[in-house]
Amino acid sequence: MNNTRRIRMLIGAMIVAAAGTAAYAGVASHALHPYLALAVLVLASITSRMKVKLPGVNGNMSVNLPFLLTAVVNLSAVEAIIVTCISTAVQCWPRKNAKLNLQQMSFNLSMMSFASCLASLVFHAQWLRALPWSSSTLALVVATGSLFLGQTAPVATIVAASEGRNAWPIWRNLTQLSFPYYVVGAGVTSMVQAVSSHLGWELALAVFPVMYGIHRSYQLYFSRMAETPRQEVLVRAAGA
């Protein structure tokens, strides 16, 4: 099987998985929160354009994770999917004079929809709430882990198929690069929840400056990571 056919099969499987979970979410969703959903959607879409290039991987990472997690925690599964899909479309929309890659857009939308729906269903699952040691913090941790796996596993698989490589080392590299950010994202989301319970969600969503700071920090960190191999090559060339 050639790479092109394998990629198309993976994208098709991802679309089917996303459609299946979205259909289930439509049945299982709880009460809607239109005003909060709109506010989270606007902030998630704005921060989705704040991207950093992942070194060693053909892809980038957006810093809107806390808003996606906020949607997972506070909104219905359907609302979380809508917020995620629209902000993902904004993130992946090509810049001026660039051509839209429909295949890539289809994969990204279905992958993010599946991951967001999975995280939302896990967070609101009755079996998780019924555990003797269950808490909102535990539910957030499990939901964040579900979102992480729902995003990174399909990405590693599609990259491996397109480049003819093993998916495991690609996923491991993605984990090393992005897992700390998921931990930070869960922490920011927990902070938003704490502020929201005392001062209201309107003030809690004012974490945009925090996300901008995280964005700048990751830009500097990854740029230094990318520069280190280049400097090593130059040193070896100079000593040759």
List each language-model region with its residue ranges.
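Membrane-embedded alpha-helical hairpins and interfacial helices in multi-pass inner-membrane proteins
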Residues: 1-238
